[in-house]
Amino acid sequence: LKENGNKLTFISMNGKTNYIKMERKIEERKNKFSGNSKIIFVIDTDNVSSNSNDLKLFNEIENYIKQKKYHLIFLNPDIERIFIPEKKIKNKSDKKIYARHFIWNDKINLNKLKSKDYSKNNTSNICIILEKIKNIIILRNNF
């Protein structure tokens, strides 16, 4: 996605444990783009509340991202329920379909997308991070 000199590029990690392996791909993409780059990791936190290994991995990723000065969007358990609040989706393949083509409607509680708690169900910090990135771009373009 490219607009007004800003470009959004998606790189799949193929699993949370591959976060360090992505560094080379990130650098390759950054070098192909002449503008300033902001890196955003998107992490699914479905098991951090119930699995100590997943919580440890999430904390490692969070520390790595802070060290690199990247941004982190977390998607908490059942995040798709924000976009489709009428029903709970149980089938994993259906969840993926809804996540890729979510339904935006007036029933969405945007406050649930402004959470700072990575363990609270049906929430994310996506609005906080995207607003922060938008402000960085606006500031950069004004100079």
Predicted regions and their residues:
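C-terminal accessory helical subdomains adjacent to catalytic cores in phosphodiester-
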Residues: 2-12, 20-143
